[in-house]
């Protein structure tokens, strides 16, 4: 059932990224962008957990957030800690 929902969600995100995002300009404070993060999270963790991770990411993407590198956790992680991905200003 979740795969039936997963593929249309990823398609909608790709449409957003291709057609709408260029009109809005680069506003995401994170790398990868929030739409890319959502696609990877849904593909990696399935519909429900992927949407949850994407919603948490979107809640952190605002002008008061420093941003930086915030990858989707790997699927061996048991718990997601958004504080572990804060930008320190030092990039490799």
UniProtKB/Swiss-Prot annotation:
Keyword Isomerase on entry: no
Chain positions covered by the region annotation Disordered: 65-92
Biased composition (Basic residues): 83-92
Cellular component, GO annotation: plasma membrane
Pfam families referenced in this protein's UniProt entry, alphabetically: YidD
This protein's record includes keyword Cell membrane: yes
UniProt KW keywords: Cell inner membrane, Cell membrane, Membrane
Bilayer topology annotation: Peripheral membrane protein
Location(s), subcellular: Cell inner membrane
SMART domains: Haemolytic
Biological function: Could be involved in insertion of integral membrane proteins into the membrane.
Family: Belongs to the UPF0161 family.
UniProt-listed HAMAP family: UPF0161_YidD
PANTHER family: MEMBRANE PROTEIN INSERTION EFFICIENCY FACTOR-RELATED
Protein name per UniProt: Putative membrane protein insertion efficiency factor
